[in-house]
């Protein structure tokens, strides 16, 4: 079986710890439920991602060096 999360075109996905997440939510002045969603079964998610976690995705960008986005893991 192929592990798509290791493919060179799949951006880095990292599960945030609660302290980091609190800082991100405070910076954007939003609640966890207001974040864009990502399905639990998405093959790009790390193995330790669980429903309710927030994942930081760092990807290449044409306009900046990198773009950082956040997604809430849902069922």
UniProtKB/Swiss-Prot annotation:
GO molecular function: DNA binding; DNA-directed RNA polymerase activity
Subcellular location as annotated: Cytoplasm
Domain of life: Archaea
UniProt keyword Cytoplasm present: yes
Keyword annotations: Cytoplasm, DNA-directed RNA polymerase, Nucleotidyltransferase, Transcription, Transferase
Reactions the enzyme catalyzes: RNA(n) + a ribonucleoside 5'-triphosphate = RNA(n+1) + diphosphate
Enzyme kind, highest EC tier: transferase
One of the protein's GO biological processes: DNA-templated transcription
EC number: 2.7.7.6
Oligomeric and partner information: Part of the RNA polymerase complex.
Family affiliation: Belongs to the archaeal Rpo5/eukaryotic RPB5 RNA polymerase subunit family.
Purpose: DNA-dependent RNA polymerase (RNAP) catalyzes the transcription of DNA into RNA using the four ribonucleoside triphosphates as substrates.
Protein name: DNA-directed RNA polymerase subunit Rpo5
């Amino acid at each position: 079986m192929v592990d798509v999360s290791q493919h060179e075109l799949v951006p880095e996905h990292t599960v945030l710890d609660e302290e980091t997440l609190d800082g991100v939510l405070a910076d954007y002045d939003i609640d966890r439920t207001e974040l864009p969603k990502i399905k639990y079964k998405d093959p790009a998610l790390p193995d330790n991602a669980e429903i309710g976690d927030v994942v930081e995705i760092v990807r290449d960008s044409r306009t900046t060096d990198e773009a950082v986005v956040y997604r809430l893991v849902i069922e």
